[in-house]
Amino acid sequence: MRTLTLLTALLLLALHTQAKSPQGTAEEAPDQEQLVMEDQDISISFGGDKGTALQDADVKAGVTCYCRRTRCGFRERLSGACGYRGRIYRLCCR
């Protein structure tokens, strides 16, 4: 059941990254991109109606996950991996 949750999170993240248009990627300096990546967390929340498929898959309401470059924060645990802009990060959930 956790695999379904992880796959759903990765799918949502992939759809989110594909929805953004690549504006100015050729002109963007690598240093600017790196600064943006250091300060950016992506939040993935699971919740909603009690009858949803995720609730049936034993997912607790209010679970929030972040793609982190470094280790997971306090009260977070490593739940897998996530991709953002072609890079792989840690998926930390609380």
UniProtKB/Swiss-Prot annotation:
Disulfide bonds join 65-93, 67-82, 72-92. PROSITE patterns: DEFENSIN (PS00269). Highest expression in bone marrow and to a much lesser extent in small intestine. The keyword Disulfide bond applies. Keywords: Antibiotic, Antimicrobial, Defensin, Disulfide bond, Fungicide, Phosphoprotein, Secreted, Signal. One of its GO terms (biological process) is antimicrobial humoral immune response mediated by antimicrobial peptide. One of its GO terms (cellular component) is extracellular space. Residues 20-62 form a propeptide. It is found in: Secreted. InterPro entries: Alpha-defensin (IPR016327), Alpha-defensin_C (IPR006081), Alpha-defensin_N (IPR002366), Beta/alpha-defensin_C (IPR006080). Residues 1-19 form the signal peptide. The modification Phosphotyrosine is found at residue 84. Active in vitro against S.aureus, fungi, Gram-positive and Gram-negative bacteria and to a lesser extent against an enveloped virus. Belongs to the alpha-defensin family. This is Neutrophil antibiotic peptide NP-1.
